[in-house]
Amino acid sequence: MSRRYKKRRFHFGVFLFFLTVVVIAGVFFIPWVMKPENFRSEKNAIYSFLYGEFQPDSYNAKSLILVDRSNNDFFISKKENEQQLPASLAKLFVIEYAATIADLDSIVPASYEAISLTKPGSSVAGIEAKDYFLHNLFAAMLVPSGNDAAYVVADYCGGILSPQTATVQDRINIFMDSLNVHLQEKGYTNTVLYDPSGYDMDALTTVLDLNSVVNQLLEFQWFRDIISQSSYTATLPDGSTQSWKNTNTFLDPTSDYYNENVIGVKTGSLSDDYNLVVLYRKYGKE
C-alpha cells in the first residue's frame, strides 16, 4: 500500500507540475498570441476562410474584395470577376495611362472646348481656361473627382499621341482608343472605357482590375500624397492656388464616417451605383 501510495503521489506531483507549467504558459502566451502583430499570417488565413467562405452574401455590394496588399491574399471576395459600372473610378485607369504619356510637371493648357464637354450635374473641380501642371489635374480628378479635369487631361494626352489632330473631341477619342489598347496590354482585360470622366453607362470594369490599377498607382508617392488628404491645395504654373475637398468622407475629421486608418483611395458614383476603393492601414499593414 505504501509503495502504491507513493507512486500515486509521484504521478499526481508530475501532473500538478505540468498543469502549473501549462497555466503559467497560458497566462503569458495567450495574450501574446492575441496581439495583432503576432501570428498575423495564420490569423489572416483563418479570417479569410471564415469571412470569405461563410459570409459572402452578408455584404450588400454587387461585388467586392478585401485584400492584404503585402501578399495579395484575399480575405473576402464576392463576384470579383463580374463586370460593373466603374463611374468615376474610371479616372484611376485614365491617370495610370496618362502618367505614361506625359511628365507630372508638364504644363497643360485647359481649353474652353475641353471644359465644356463636362456633362451638366456631374462632379467638377472648377477647372478654368488656363495653364495647369499635369499633377494639378490628376489631383483635381482624384480629390473632388473633377470630370472637367478628366476631359482636359484626355485632350492634352490625345494631342501628344496625335499632334496633327485638330479638334478636342477627336483628340479625346484618340486618347480613349489608345487607353483601351493599353488596358488590354496591362492585363485589365475586363475593363473597357469610353469617357475619360467615367460619366458613361456603357463602361465596364471588375474589382480585380481596380485592385490591379490601384496597386500600380500606389507605387508612386505623388499618388499617395494626393489620395490621403481630406482637402488638397494645388499650386498652378502661374503661382496661384486652387483647393479642393475630398469626396471620401472617411478622410474628413469632421465627418461621422471619419476613420484615422483610412488613407485613400477614391469614390465613384453614377445613377444608382456607388463605388469606393479604400486603402486601410493598421499596424503598418495595408
Model region roles, listed by residue range:
Residues 14-29:
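Hydrophobic membrane-insertion alpha-helices, especially the h-region
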Residues 1-14:
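N-terminal Lys/Arg-rich, disordered targeting/topogenic segments
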Residues 32-208, 217-221:
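Active-site-adjacent loops and short helices of periplasmic peptidoglycan-processing enzymes
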Residues 188-189, 201-209, 214-286:
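Domain-terminus/edge residues, biased toward the C-terminal soluble/receptor-binding domains
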